[in-house]
Design a protein with these regions (language model features):
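Canonical Rossmann dinucleotide-binding motif of NAD(H)/NADP(H)-dependent dehydrogenases/reductases
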Residues: 7-36
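Substrate-binding pocket helix/loop in short-chain dehydrogenase/reductase
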Residues: 98-99, 103-111, 204
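Active-site helix of classical SDR
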Residues: 122, 159, 167
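Alpha-helical segment proximal to the catalytic Tyr-Lys
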Residues: 127, 172-173, 232
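Residue(s) in the substrate-gating loop at a strand-loop-helix junction
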Residues: 142
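Short, small/polar-rich loop/turn modules that mediate ligand/substrate recognition or access, typified
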Residues: 175, 180, 234-236, 242
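A conserved structural motif in NAD(P)-dependent oxidoreductases
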Residues: 208-219, 230
Length: 248
């Protein structure tokens, strides 16, 4: 795999990296020369995914709802690598629960996974990157956080909107210290097709001006741009990756 950007000598953490968009991001960074930690709630799957990348990749068990897991990951990676250069907050959860059936517990869990985790990660890793005088943080949000969602449930859309605002906040806080914080907002992506009926897939494709779902690798390419040296002037940006479904 030929990488679009050079990450030689960089050290990256990607959450939700056992599969899907997260794994594609990890592959892109690794192909560019980065050492990559693939973190996931399913630690065994993260380790298996890391093994497919070969050397300079490792798997971690990380529950993004728990700040102590972020702290443990920070301590382990700093001890192993001496530094962390790139943090990609990709982990997410998008249940398709009908509004009337959403419980308070599910609502809180969705917010914890999709929004509070971004805060926890920035709170834990921000000072590390700041002390180094250089770093990149990229948050994977969603089109649902921009337009309220259609297929997505309301708690997911609200949490992703919050993640976009946290991106803006931490971008302004950390930019003076050489650390950029940005986001991508994926629209319909092929990794989600398995959760949809053929009729839903066709209906979504008909609404997307480009006429198709995105590939996970297209999301990874955008993250790589934001994480690269060439992406150093992006600060607090959210890149719209939706095939024209939402234009602003």
């Amino acid at each position: 795999m030929r990488a679009a950007f050079d990450f030689d000598g960089r050290h990256a953490l990607v959450t939700g990296a056992a599969r899907g968009i997260g794994l594609a991001i990890a592959r892109e960074l690794h192909a560019g020369g980065a050492r990559v930690a693939l973190a996931d709630l399913d630690g065994d799957a993260a380790a298996a995914a890391a093994a497919t990348l070969g050397v300079h990749a490792l798997g971690l068990t990380l529950d993004v709802r728990r700040v102590d897991h972020f702290e443990a990951a920070r301590d382990r990676l700093v001890a192993a690598w001496g530094r962390i250069d790139i943090v990609v907050n990709n982990a997410g959860w998008a249940p398709l629960t009908p509004v009337a059936a959403i419980t308070a517990a599910e609502f809180d869990d969705v917010v914890a996974v999709n929004m509070r985790s971004v805060f926890s990660s920035c709170q834990v890793f921000g000072p590390v990157l700041q002390a180094q005088g250089h770093g990149r943080m990229v948050n994977v949000t969603s089109l649902a956080g921009q337009n309220g969602g259609t297929v997505a449930a309301p708690h997911y859309a609200a949490a992703k909107a919050g993640a976009i605002m946290l991106t803006k906040y931490f971008a302004q806080l950390l930019a003076p210290h050489g650390v950029t914080v940005n986001a991508i907002a994926p629209g319909p992506t092929a990794t989600a097709k398995g959760r949809l009926s053929p009729e839903q897939v066709s209906a979504i494709e008909a609404r997307v001006p480009i006429g198709r779902f995105a590939e996970a690798e297209e999301m990874a390419a955008a993250v790589a741009l934001l994480a690269s040296d060439r992406g150093g002037f992006f600060v607090g940006a959210t890149l719209d990756l939706n095939g024209g479904l939402y234009v602003r």
